[in-house]
Amino acid sequence: MSKRPSISFSDFAAPEKGVSIVLVAKGGGFADEAAQAAGGAEKIKRIAEISGFTGALGKTAEAIETTSSGVDKIVLVGVGEPGKLGNDDWLKIGGAAFSRIGKAERATVTLALPETTIAGDEAADLALGMILRSYKFERYKTRKNNEENGDPKHAAKISICVADPHTAKRAFEVAEAVADGVIQARNLVNEPANILGPVEFAQEAEKLEKLGVKIEVLGEKEMKKLGMGALLGVAQGSVRPPRLVIMEWQGAKSKEKPVAFVGKGVVFDTGGISIKPAAGMEDMKGDMGGAAAVTGLMRALAGRKAKVNAIGIIGLVENMPDGNAQRPGDIVTSMSGQTIEVINTDAEGRLVLADALHYTNDRFKPRFIINLATLTGAVMVALGQYHAGLFSNDDELADQLYDAGQLTGEKLWRLPLGTEYDKMIDSKFADMKNSAGRYGGSITAAQFLKRFVGETAWAHLDVAGTAMGSPANEYSQTWASGYGVRLLDRLVRDHFES
């Protein structure tokens, strides 16, 4: 695995060795501190001129330093318009800066801009972007080519010079806990399914106990007793036993109702008897991206000691087509008592979530439930890979989620729910069917889930296009993005902590 850079914060000082990184605004503006760190204003101007560098957000330029100062390289990083920078922008700046460190073991970032004071949380966001950019998943590479993309062989020591290093350091303690959560989610999604089955995933979740998270794991026997016929119907085609993991973080007074997050955890999805095409099926190791995000979120909340009571529940199964597998036409009874006709065994995620959602609502009676799932290809057709689909029965919760997405760059787009769509999942033989056909596929899937949350405020995030295989950016370079951890941490931080 990649080595995380060691990051510290200090007052402004001239860099003594390694890489000197300075910020430049759109149009070429820079602070006096940047000029000092680069060896003079003319040097910055010259590097920008010969590189065609304009200071656009996330763009970089560099020059080898040949003086006896001890600095090996000067890097300019564009920040765009300083007055318009948000959380996601600082992550991009940090990621872009880290990408230019190369093999250097030391780097100094001078965090100063003209006529602008950079706050501690902005410095922490930049540092978070550096950590996330440093991430690689190379656990199974026996020969690693570190020169392939210029990333360092060793963990870089990075000093960030900022006006208020004490505040930045405190903000970074929170940001680093969030980084831990994102990286855990990425690791889980990247892990191959022959290594990470339901049992192994549950064991990874149990490691959160050392952070103070209470963990409970239900096996097949316990789920049968609870009547979870929908989840168990999916699992019956695999020799690997299912698990339901309950994670509890108590960071507020015990009488406060918890917030709840539920994740789809299909560790590998062949489609079952309604088997998928072979091409691209290898990506279905990531069909547990929702469960990975919920696990990563619980790690982040516990790591930063969030002042909230939070529940994370993940349903872990493997969808396989053996002789005991669920068939199209089967009818299963969910924990809620509602019956479901299985039209398509490849619409399995909603069956897993049906029981997980009802269990969460019935046992914990939370303030709200948010579920995450790589649920439908239809949402990718509608929104591509830059927004996750948002469905909700509560406008206030939907607005809060949308705003958190805009702030973090983990963007959402709300799609409709309605009685017309709900009628499409009615069945002639059961209370409902698990697939209504091609039209409005992501909407009818959401309507299905809505039948299992009662009157509780609820939102469904369809992350099929964003949790895995989404386009690389300045701070996410691997197949798994860790989507959802930063989004939901921000939601909790802004609205639900005491």
Swiss-Prot record:
Q: Name one GO cellular component term.
A: cytoplasm
Q: Where in the cell is it found?
A: Cytoplasm
| GO molecular function, a single term | metalloaminopeptidase activity
Required co-factors: Mn(2+)
An individual GO BP term:
proteolysis
Give the record's cofactor note, including how many are bound.
Binds 2 manganese ions per subunit.
What Pfam families does the database record attribute to this sequence?
Peptidase_M17, Peptidase_M17_N
Annotated Mn(2+) 2 binding lies at 264, 269, 287, 348
Active-site residues, record numbering mapped to chain: 276, 350
This entry's Enzyme Commission designation comes to: 3.4.11.1, 3.4.11.10
Cite the InterPro entries for this sequence. Answer: Leucine_aapep/pepB, Macro_dom-like, Peptidase_M17_C, Peptidase_M17_leu_NH2_pept, Peptidase_M17_N
Reaction equations catalysed: Release of an N-terminal amino acid, Xaa-|-Yaa-, in which Xaa is preferably Leu, but may be other amino acids including Pro although not Arg or Lys, and Yaa may be Pro. Amino acid amides and methyl esters are also readily hydrolyzed, but rates on arylamides are exceedingly low; Release of an N-terminal amino acid, preferentially leucine, but not glutamic or aspartic acids
Q: What class of enzyme is it?
A: hydrolase
Q: What is its main location?
A: cytoplasm
Q: Where does Mn(2+) 1 bind?
A: 269, 346, 348
What role is this protein assigned? Presumably involved in the processing and regular turnover of intracellular proteins. Catalyzes the removal of unsubstituted N-terminal amino acids from various peptides.
- Which family does this protein fall into? Belongs to the peptidase M17 family.
| UniProt cross-references to PANTHER family, sorted A to Z | CYTOSOL AMINOPEPTIDASE, LEUCINE AMINOPEPTIDASE-RELATED
HAMAP family recorded for this chain? Cytosol_peptidase_M17
Name used for this protein in its record: Probable cytosol aminopeptidase
* Biological source species: Brucella anthropi (strain ATCC 49188 / DSM 6882 / CCUG 24695 / JCM 21032 / LMG 3331 / NBRC 15819 / NCTC 12168 / Alc 37)
What lineage, starting at the top, does this entry show? Bacteria, Pseudomonadati, Pseudomonadota, Alphaproteobacteria, Hyphomicrobiales
Question: What gene codes for this chain?
Answer: pepA
